[in-house]
Structure formats: structure tokens, C-alpha cells
Amino acid sequence: DVFSPSIWSGWYSGSYKSYQKAVDKYKKEYKHFLHTEYGGSSHVGRHTENPITGEGKIQADGWEEAIVQSDVPNIAKVGDWSENYIVDLFDWHLRISENDTAFVGNAQWAFKDFGTPLRPENPIPYVNQKGLVDRNNNPKDAFYVFKSYWNDTTPFAYIESHTWTNRQGPKGLKRSVSVYSNCSEIELFLNGKSLGVKKRNTNDFPAAGLNWNVDFVDGNNVLTAIAKTKDGDEIKDELNVNYR
């Protein structure tokens, strides 16, 4: 027999960085622990420069004092349902499940957002938004997180996020940019200038270490990610970001 509990670390309660504690607890109690029900909801195209942290805190944005951070006891109720947060949550969960040799397995139970009579209070009433694609089959950013871990046949690179083309912030404040890929290394360029090569390591977070702090210029910015495959071929992804 296989045991698969519901563990909603970082959604209905707690923080997603407490996931390992829950996993360790059930591994001791059950020899065949498979986890299939976890995650959270997100709106396609909703983004924030400051997603709730892995510790379950609303974080400051450089110009605020860190002391004003506040805890979020139930992110499902008071969170912003941004794609950024759910990407981080899934990334953390997969990082643990893929690297824990005592973990029997993992599956994603909701591939697509779906209608339900049980969710009249949701931002989109009667729709459960825990899927990796929306009702029109448009992939959310979380789709590419899973693809980076579970697809080893089709090389790809995806700059987070193609639905986040307008960003803002104080001049000189670097912004985080992640690239999700199943290739071994990525080089990221900003307006044709290399920001360095990083190697993928699933023990690293976020994006298996494929993360850069980018100093956007005012106006249009062109981000280019170039991945190298095992065969030496190059895979490219490009994104235009308007920064103000």
C-alpha cells in the first residue's frame, strides 16, 4: 500500500519551507510515502516584486525597514495569488522531493484549473486555480518549474515570466530574474551584455541556482537566456521587459 496525505505547507497553513518537517514525519510512519496533494492557487499574469517569503512573511522592498515584515498565517485567504509565490512554493517542494532518496514519489494532482461548486468565494468564483495551466490551456509559470524537473527529453529554457513584461522600482535596485531549464547551464544577457554563466544544481534554490540579480535600465530591456544541451546545441529564450 501507498500512503499519500494532504500537506499544504505554505498555502492553507504554515510556510513552504516547513515542508521538509512534514515529509520527515510521514517517512518515519509510512514506508511507502507518495505525495500528490499540495501546492496553491495562482492567477495567470499576476506578479509581484515581493512575493511572500518561504518563511511565510510579507517582505520589505529595500526602502522599507525589515522590522515591518508581518507573518501570514493563511496565504490562501490573505495572499495575492501571484504566480511568483506559487513558482517558489512548487520549486521548493520539488527540490525536496527530487533530492530525498527516501521519498517514494511525487505527482501533481491538478494539471489544469477546473470548475468546482465548492469555491464560490474564490477570486474567480467556482474555479479552483491550483492547476499548472489555466482554463484555456495557457501554461502558468509553475508549468515550467515542473518541466525543468520532470522533462529530460526536450531541452528548453524559460525566463520567468513571459506574462511579466512591465516591472518597476527605484533606480539602481537590482531585481531577481530566474530561468527555468532542464539544461546543465545557462548564460543570461541583458541588452546584449552577459550577466554570467550559471550551472544548474537541483540542491540550489530558487530555479536550481539559475537566478540573477539584474540592474534594469529605464525603459525597454531585452533579456536573453542561452542554454547548452548535452549535445552542445544552444537553446534560446528571449523576453522584453519595460522597466520604470
Regions of interest found by a model, annotated:
Residues 201-203, 242-243:
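A short, sequence-level motif marking secondary-structure junctions
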